C-alpha cells in the first residue's frame, strides 16, 4: 500500500494497529503507531528509512510491488533504531550494493544491529547534500541525541519537505496520513505525550537544533515524520509547540501520584487535593495511583504540571516499589521548572517520605515541605492534610490568590492529647528553607500530635448539624439518620455508633467533620 505525499514522494511505510508496548514496555502505545518510510522518484530513486523489523518481509514485498528494487539508487537512514531501519537486512539481501547514506554514528549502530559491516555506507554530516536530479537535492542535518547519537533529518529542496525522523512525531495510528485529516485534540495529546516521555531529557538540544534549522532560512511546506501523521497543514505549528515545550514548560496544574497498601496514603492524597482546590479553584489537579494508572499518562501530566506531590506508604522502611520506579523514570526525564513535595502514611517507621524527598531533590525539583501521617489518618489528620494542600496552593500559585483565612487552630506548643496514636509529621530538607504549614515555622522535622476528637474549625458542633465525609463528600443528615445501619432519623452525630461506616466509601466516623452550611445545601 502506498499513499501519495507530494509530487514524486510516496509513503511506503507500515501501520501497526495492534502494538501496545514500545521500547520494551516503557511506552504504552494505546493508539498504535506507524513506521513511516518514503519513496522519492526523481532523477534518482531514493528510499528514506524502512520499518520495524517485525514487518521486514511484508515491507520488502510491498516495496517490490511499487518499484523494481534494483532501480533504487540510494537508501537514506535517518535513525538506526530497529523501528526505523529494522527491514534493512531483508532489503539489502535483495539489493546488496545499494549505497546507504547516514551519519557516522549510525554506521556503528546499524552494523551493531544487522552485523553487515560490508554494506556500502556513505557517512554524511550537517550541510552535506545529495543531488537527486530534476534540480532537487537532499540536504542532511545531524540531530545527535534527538534522541540517539546517530539521529539526523533530511531536507528535500524545491518540494520543501523536511523528513524529521523522531522529532515532531507521535505514536498514533490512523487510517489517514495527514494532520488536517485527524482529530486535532487527540493528535496534540499524542504529540505532547510523545515529547514528554521521549524527548524531554533533550529539551536544550531541541531548542538549539530547531533554531539552527530555522537559521538556514529554508521554506518548509511539509514535515514528514517517522511515526504518526505527516504535517502538511501549517507544519510550523508543531515546530513552535516544540519550542514551547522545550522552554521549561509548565501549566497551572498539579499532579499527585501515590501507591498505598491500606488506602491511608490515598486518603491523604484526596484531602491534600481538596485543600488545594479550596484555595485555588482554578488550578487543575489530577490524582493517580501508580499501581493502576498508565505510567506514561502520569509522566505526561508531570511534564505539564507546575507542581508534583508524590505519596507512598512505608514498606520495609522504604517507599513502595512502583513509586520508586516512577521516580527513577522522572529522574531520567530531567523535568525542569517544577515544585515537588512528598507525603505518605506509616506505622512504626516512616522512611518512605524522606527517601521520596531526597529523590525529588536529586531529580532537580524545587522541594517544598513534606507530610507524614502515622497509621490511618483520622478527621483531624485529614484536616491537616487539607491545610497542607492550602499552603502548597499558595506557595505554588502562578497568579495572586485571595488572602488565606485561618483554618487550623492547633499549635505545636499546645497540642491536644493523642487519643489514638495518630501523628502527623511535617518535614522539610534544610535546602528548602523555612515553610509555614498552618503551624509555627520550622526547618528540619517535627511531629504534631492530633486528637481524633478535635474538629478542625472554630465553630461549635450542634446536635442537628450535618456531617461531611472528607473522603467521598457523602453527608450525614441527623434528620434522616441512616436506616441501613440502624441509625434512626433524629440521631445526632455524637450518638451515632462508632461502628458506623460511610455509605459512600466505607470508611469510619473518623473521616467526618462538621459540614459548613453552604456545603450542605
Curated annotation (Swiss-Prot):
FMN binds at residues 260-264, 342-369. Fe cation 3 binds at residues 469, 472, 502, 505. Residues 30-210 are annotated as: Zinc metallo-hydrolase. Disulfide bonds: none annotated. Residues 254-393 form the Flavodoxin-like domain. Residues 464-515 form the Rubredoxin-like domain. InterPro entries: Anaer_NO_rdtase_flvorubredoxin, Flavodoxin/NO_synth, Flavoprotein-like_sf, Metallo-B-lactamas, ODP_dom, RibonucZ/Hydroxyglut_hydro, Rubredoxin-like_dom, Rubredoxin_dom. Binds 3 Fe cations per monomer. Pfam families: Flavodoxin_1, ODP, Rubredoxin. GO terms for cellular component: cytoplasm. The keyword Oxidoreductase applies. The keyword Transport applies. Keywords: Cytoplasm, Electron transport, Flavoprotein, FMN, Iron, Metal-binding, Oxidoreductase, Transport. NCBIfam families: PRK05452.1. Homotetramer. Anaerobic nitric oxide reductase; uses NADH to detoxify nitric oxide (NO), protecting several 4Fe-4S NO-sensitive enzymes. Has at least 2 reductase partners, only one of which (NorW, flavorubredoxin reductase) has been identified. NO probably binds to the di-iron center; electrons enter from the NorW at rubredoxin and are transferred sequentially to the FMN center and the di-iron center. Also able to function as an aerobic oxygen reductase. This is Anaerobic nitric oxide reductase flavorubredoxin. It comes from Aeromonas salmonicida (strain A449).
Amino acid at each position: 500500500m502506498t499513499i501519495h505525499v507530494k509530487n514524486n514522494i510516496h509513503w511506503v511505510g507500515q501501520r501497526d494497529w495492534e502494538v501496545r508496548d514500545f521500547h520494551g514496555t516503557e511506552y504504552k502505545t494505546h493508539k498504535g503507531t506507524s513506521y513511516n518510510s518514503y519513496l522519492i522518484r526523481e532523477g534518482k530513486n531514493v528510499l528514506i528509512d524502512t520499518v520495524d523489523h517485525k514487518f521486514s518481509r511484508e515491507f520488502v514485498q510491498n516495496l517490490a510491488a511499487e518499484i523494481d528494487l534494483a532501480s533504487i539508487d540510494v537508501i537514506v537512514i535517518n535513525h538506526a533504531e530497529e523501528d526505523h531501519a529494522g527491514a534493512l537486512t531483508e532489503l539489502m539481501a535483495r539489493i546488496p550494493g545499494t549505497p546507504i547514506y547516514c551519519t557516522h554514528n549510525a554506521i556503528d549502530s546499524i552494523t551493531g544491529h544487522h552485523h553487515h559491516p560490508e554494506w556500502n555506507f556513505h557517512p554524511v554530516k550537517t550541510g552535506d547534500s545529495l543531488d537527486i536530479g530534476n534540480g532537487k537535492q537532499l540536504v542532511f542535518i545531524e540531530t545527535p541525541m534527538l534522541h540517539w547519537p546517530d539521529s539526523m533529518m533530511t531536507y528535500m529542496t524545491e518540494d520543501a519537505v523536511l523528513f524529521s525522523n523522531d522529532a515532531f512525531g507521535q505514536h498514533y495510528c490512523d487510517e489517514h496520513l495527514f494532520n488536517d485529516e485527524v482529530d486535532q485534540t487527540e493528535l496534540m495529546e499524542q504529540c505532547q505525550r510523545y515529547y514528554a516521555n521521549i524527548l524531554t531529557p533533550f529539551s536544550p538540544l531541541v531548542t538549539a537544533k530547531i533554531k539552527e534549522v530555522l537559521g538556514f532560512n529554508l521554506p518548509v511546506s511539509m514535515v514528514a515524520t517517522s511515526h504518526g501523521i505527516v504535517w502538511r497543514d501549517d507544519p510550523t505549528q508543531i515546530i513552535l509547540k516544540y519550542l514551547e515545550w522545550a522552554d521549561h514548560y509548565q501549566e497551572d496544574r498539579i499532579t499527585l501520584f501515590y501507591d498505598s497498601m491500606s488506602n491511608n496514603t490515598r486518603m491523604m492524597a484526596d484531602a491534600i487535593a481538596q485543600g488545594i482546590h479550596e484555595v485555588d479553584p482554578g488550578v487543575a489537579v489530577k490524582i493517580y495511583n501508580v499501581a493502576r494508572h498508565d505510567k506514561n499518562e502520569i509522566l505526561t501530566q508531570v511534564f505539564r504540571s507546575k507542581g508534583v506531590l508524590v505519596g507512598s506508604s512505608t514498606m520495609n522502611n522504604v517507599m513502595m516499589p512502583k513509586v520508586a520506579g516512577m521516580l527513577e523514570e522522572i529522574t531520567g526525564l530531567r523535568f525542569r521548572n517544577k515544585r515537588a513535595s512528598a507525603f505518605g502514611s506509616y506505622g512504626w517507621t516512616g522512611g518512605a517520605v524522606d527517601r521520596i524527598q531526597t529523590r525529588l531533590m536529586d531529580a532537580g525539583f524545587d522541594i517544598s515541605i513534606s507530610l507524614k501521617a502515622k497509621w490511618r489518618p483520622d478527621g483531624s489528620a485529614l484536616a491537616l492534610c487539607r491545610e497542607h494542600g492550602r499552603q502548597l496552593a499558595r506557595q505554588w500559585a502562578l497568579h495572586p490568590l485571595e488572602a488565606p483565612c485561618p483554618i487550623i487552630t492547633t499549635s505545636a506548643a499546645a497540642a491536644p492529647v493523642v487519643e489514638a496514636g495518630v501523628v502527623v509529621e511535617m518535614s522539610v530538607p534544610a535546602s528548602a528553607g523555612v515553610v509555614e504549614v498552618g503551624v509555627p515555622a520550622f526547618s528540619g522535622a517535627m511531629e504534631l500530635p492530633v486528637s481524633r476528637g478535635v474538629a478542625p474549625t472554630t465553630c461549635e458542633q450542634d446536635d442537628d448539624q450535618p456531617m461531611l465525609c472528607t473522603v467521598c463528600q457523602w453527608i450525614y443528615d441527623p434528620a434522616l439518620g441512616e436506616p441501613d445501619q440502624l441509625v434512626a432519623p433524629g440521631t445526632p452525630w455524637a450518638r451515632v455508633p462508632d461502628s458506623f461506616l460511610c455509605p459512600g466509601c466505607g470508611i469510619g466516623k473518623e473521616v467526618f467533620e462538621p459540614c459548613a452550611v453552604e456545603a450542605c445545601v
